[in-house]
Design a protein with these regions (language model features):
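Basic, flexible Lys/Arg- and Gly-enriched helix-loop patches that mediate nucleic-acid binding at interfaces
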Residues: 1-150
Length: 150
């Protein structure tokens, strides 16, 4: 059977990606109405201002669209560095969404990594490695997706 990625990562983005051959499962995980959280670490050029942090948390206007609110925390914003590390959790996953959110606020994303899809993390995996999800993990994702639908 054909195995395909569940969702996508931009060419310049690394991190967690689920692969599946189940079309129904893929739709459950990728459709925004199911509210499956994806967590990223973004390294942005410049210091993230408080007012921009608030905008990220309430939704960013991109063209004629306003994103859903993101859960955002500053991981590292040293005085000596001109860059900021930010952890964001979103559930929409539109094309280049995080990069476009920061660009709309005047920041360049220098590096972007998806750390987690819901509770599934990269913990214990090196770059390029993979593992098979347990039945419990798959059921948990399906339950979350079904409960997230409004």
């Amino acid at each position: 059977e054909r195995v395909v990625p569940v969702g996508r990562l931009d060419y310049d983005t690394s991190g967690a990606l689920i692969m599946s051959n189940d079309g129904e499962f893929i739709n459950l995980i990728t459709h925004p109405r199911h509210k499956i959280n994806k967590t990223y670490i973004a390294k942005i050029g410049g210091k993230l201002e408080d007012r921009h942090l608030k905008i990220l948390r309430s939704g960013v206007r991109i063209d004629n669209y306003k994103t859903a609110p993101a859960e955002v925390n500053i991981v590292k914003n040293k005085n000596k560095s001109s860059n900021t590390l930010v952890r964001l959790t979103i559930h929409e996953g539109k094309n280049r969404q995080i990069r476009r959110m920061f660009e709309a606020l005047g920041y360049e994303v220098l590096k972007l990594k998806r750390e987690a899809i819901e509770d599934l993390t990269l913990e214990g995996l090196k770059k390029g490695e993979y593992r098979v999800l347990t039945i419990h993990e798959v059921k948990k994702l399906i339950n979350k997706a079904n409960n997230g639908e409004k």
